[in-house]
A protein has these predicted regions:
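Extracytoplasmic gate region of multi-pass secondary transporters
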Residues: 28-39, 143, 222-238, 304-306, ...
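Glycine-rich segments within core transmembrane alpha-helices of 12-TM secondary carriers
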Residues: 51-62, 136-191, 205-229, 363-366
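Central cavity-lining transmembrane alpha-helices of secondary-active solute carriers
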Residues: 52-73, 86-92, 96, 156, ...
Length: 380
């Protein structure tokens, strides 16, 4: 991404589009039910052993704390590369086993590779969320809602693409999980960077909010498109191919925002080549002295809600622990259901449970989008 494109203001929007694409392919933690039955039959596992494999996958996300610490000292591109390589190894090993290209690995080895696959998404999530929230400090709620919404949709995207083109084959599904995120993350390293954001006037803030409404609208259209494909039953080969093409077009549609921003606000030559002449002597800032009492007060002052916190400042707040306990108690039940969706469907007599996984993903997306918009309304 050239300096002209970055300075024009479209650079951070292109970075957001790259982040959306990363999120659209990194929801692989929620796809275990698509291939869990294949692992169970191939490795002759009991239901308890299969559940422990899903736990190993979820434990990988618990190590996401490492990605959070690393985000303060490593650039976005390095975080994305770590996540893509880890996912390629973790899901690649599972693909080799399910496709019978190698002999089944031992149980503990499979636990390690599932843990790696689960942890890979934390690096991708951290990279895009931290970078985009720093690029859009006044719209953190919409940014979070959009990016986490696409994570929810990613399960439906993977599931429906695999169903449309490969008839829900577990080995092909795992191959896609291993390769596609690696390709997208490596591509995103060229576009997703932290861009210094100058103070905006009210007009620019309104325009930024309008752009986020466009992103939300595109995401909702994509969700409805996936929902329509799921509820319309079986499709022929031609319709499935048409669906796949339409899905790729919808995923590319967010590019219209940075393109419009680039065309509508081009930089003039004077903005680039002629620096502003500023007197070095006139308008010198007045020096002020700070008393010891005032200095101690400034050092003790904590950032308010909505401002950047260090990790130490964060764990000292009551709000963090409320969120932590709520997340700890609430997410586990949902993950338990999603991990066992395949076994539940088979127990109820369904040979293909992909539609249930996809529908769960789509409705999860609507909840994520709503939470981002509502939280932004009350915080700002």
């Amino acid at each position: 991404m050239g300096p002209f494109f970055s300075l024009s203001g479209a650079g951070k929007w292109l970075g957001l589009v790259a982040a959306i694409w990363v999120q659209a392919i990194c929801g692989n933690n929620y796809t275990f039910a698509n291939y869990s039955d294949a692992l169970k039959s191939l490795m002759s596992l009991t239901q308890l052993q299969l559940n422990n494999l899903s736990v190993a996958k979820d434990v990988g996300k618990a190590f996401g704390l490492v990605a959070g610490f690393a985000s303060d000292c490593l650039p976005t591109s390095v975080l994305l590369i770590i996540g893509s390589v880890e996912g390629l190894i973790g899901y690649g090993a599972q693909w080799l086993v399910v496709s019978r290209r190698i002999h089944p690995l031992t149980y503990w080895q499979m636990c390690v590779f599932l843990c790696m696959g689960g942890n890979s998404t934390t690096w991708m999530n951290t990279a895009v969320l931290v970078t985009c929230m720093r690029n859009f400090p006044k719209n953190r709620g919409p940014v979070s809602g959009i990016l986490k919404g696409y994570v929810g949709l990613s399960t439906a995207i993977f599931t429906d693409i695999c169903t449309a083109l490969f008839s829900s084959d577990p080995s092909t599904f795992l191959f896609i999980l291993a390769v596609v995120p690696a390709i997208v993350c490596l591509t995103a390293t060229f576009f997703l960077h932290e861009i210094p954001t100058p103070t905006k006037n009210p007009t620019e803030l309104r325009q930024e909010t309008l752009y986020f409404h466009v992103f939300n609208g595109i995401a909702i259209i994509l969700a409805v498109y996936l929902l329509a494909f799921d509820i319309t039953g079986n499709h022929g080969r031609v319709l499935s191919l048409a669906f796949a093409v339409g899905l790729l077009v919808l995923l590319a549609t967010p590019l219209s925002v940075p393109l419009y921003s680039f065309i509508s606000k081009p930089l003039s030559d004077s903005d680039i080549e002629r620096p502003m002449k500023v007197s070095l002597l006139a308008d010198q800032p007045k020096t002020t002295t700070t008393t010891g009492v005032e200095l101690q007060y400034l050092e003790r002052k904590r950032p308010s809600i909505g401002e950047d916190h260090t990790i130490v400042e964060m764990i000292r707040t009551f709000d963090f622990w409320v969120l932590f306990v709520s997340f700890l108690c609430g997410v586990g039940t949902g993950m338990c259901v999603m991990n066992n969706m395949g076994q539940m469907g088979i127990a109820l007599g369904y040979l293909d449970v992909s539609i249930f996984i996809s529908l769960t993903s789509i409705w999860g997306f609507f909840g994520r989008i709503a939470s981002g918009l509502i939280s932004e309304y009350y915080i700002w």
